């Protein structure tokens, strides 16, 4: 009797796994409540190819805390610590093309920079933004127009 019960439980578990794999994993979907998935899918709070969710990401990013991957995603765009090629918006954005909180994000930047707290990178930015320039340029605290290699004007 105990053996039959174990056999039934095993069959149920295997069939459940098979359904989950066909429905989620191979369609790029979930894989857990707070993230996962074979193709970068979120799960729980996101899902799909390039999903999202808490700790999501993958190709195309998606939305949710901790997004990212190619094309950004996350909380408003880049997510907490997001970024990737194309950046996006949200705390900690960045990557190629900038993004982040208002542009560069907290510590953001990347090629093309942008505006926001701690911007910079190639094309600069900075706290309050402005238009950055050069390698690590930027307007400094409050903006202005940056230029040269790390140069730029400082406007308090």
Swiss-Prot record:
Alphabetically, which GO biological process terms does the record hold?
A: antibacterial humoral response; antifungal humoral response; innate immune response; killing of cells of another organism
- Modified-residue entries (Lysine amide), positions: 155
| Species whose genome carries this gene | Acanthoscurria gomesiana (Tarantula spider)
Domain of life the protein comes from = Eukaryota
Q: Which subcellular locations apply to this protein?
A: Secreted
Tissue spec: Expressed in hemocytes and secreted into the plasma following bacterial immune challenge.
May I ask which residue range the UniProt record assigns to the signal sequence? 1-23
Keyword annotations for this protein, in alphabetical order, are: Amidation, Antibiotic, Antimicrobial, Fungicide, Immunity, Innate immunity, Secreted, Signal
From the UniProt record, report the name of the gene that encodes this protein.
Answer: acantho1
The record's Gene Ontology cellular component field reads:
extracellular region
Q: Which family does it belong to?
A: Belongs to the glycine-rich peptide family.
State its role: Antimicrobial protein. Strong activity against the Gram-negative bacterium E.coli SBS363 and yeast C.albicans. No detectable activity against the Gram-positive bacterium M.luteus.
Its recorded name reads Acanthoscurrin-1
* Predominant cellular place of this UniProt entry's protein: secreted
